[in-house]
A protein has these predicted regions:
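N-terminal core-binding DNA-recognition domain of tyrosine recombinases/integrases
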Residues: 1-12, 25-30, 65, 93, ...
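Flexible interdomain linker/hinge and immediately adjacent N-terminus
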Residues: 1-23, 72, 103-108
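Catalytic-site neighborhood detector that most strongly recognizes the C-terminal catalytic loop/helix
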Residues: 15, 71-72, 160, 165-185
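Short, charged phosphate-coordinating catalytic segments
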Residues: 43-63
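C-terminal secondary-structure termini that scaffold catalytic or DNA-interacting sites
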Residues: 187-201
């Protein structure tokens, strides 16, 4: 069966961009919601699932890494240096001595519905389309950013905790516009330059 263009190239209005990610983080800080800003930065810089935020604990900050338990497997993620610094500042400021860092007013770890609701509200203030913000949107952005730098899908699959690389491929699909930009950079069509007298010898 043939594939539609939507299946080959994801819609541009469905994936959050780095610029929009920055707008969300900056807006959260400006609103005084440091917890939400740090949640977004943690998701964006580590690629973890929202459901795995509970494993980001005060204790894990001592080692600069966290062990994530999911579906009977353990995955170790490392904290970027800057994230580690600001998380340590945050727990000190909020007097969080142990356990999960991102908690509700009742002291429970934030869950998927909590975070999704907060992000949707933030979108309106930041001027970012709500359609682009869904539970895995920051994870997708992390995957695309990591792959652009590392260009190693097997390593990315390990970082994301995917048992199949086929799942990882979904995360790093480029839009039609990005793909066309890459094709243009290849400069494999020589006709115009030849007609303009480009010396090929």
């Amino acid at each position: 069966p043939s594939c539609s263009s939507e299946e080959i190239f994801p819609a541009e209005n469905k994936e959050i961009t780095m610029h929009e990610y920055e707008k969300l983080v900056k807006t959260a800080y400006k609103k005084g919601d440091k917890r939400l800003a740090l949640i977004i930065e943690t998701l964006g810089s580590t690629g973890i699932r929202i459901s795995e935020l509970r494993h980001i604990t005060v204790e894990s900050l001592k080692y600069g890494m966290a062990d994530l338990h999911n579906k009977g497997k353990v995955r170790r993620i490392l904290y970027p240096s800057e994230l580690l610094r600001i998380l340590r500042e945050y727990v000190k400021e909020k007097h969080i001595c142990s356990g999960s860092i991102f908690i509700t007013s009742k002291g429970n770890p934030v869950n998927r519905s909590n975070v999704w609701r907060m992000m949707k509200n933030l979108c309106r203030d930041a001027g970012v389309s709500e359609e682009k913000v869904y539970p895995h949107s920051m994870r997708h952005l992390f995957a695309r950013s990591f792959y652009k730098i590392k260009n190693d899908i097997a390593k990315l699959a390990d970082v994301l905790g995917h048992s199949s690389i086929d799942t990882t491929r979904i995360y790093i699909k480029t839009t039609g516009k990005e793909h066309k930009r890459q094709l243009n950079k290849m400069k494999m069509v020589l006709g115009t330059r030849l007609r303009e007298g480009w010396d090929v010898m």
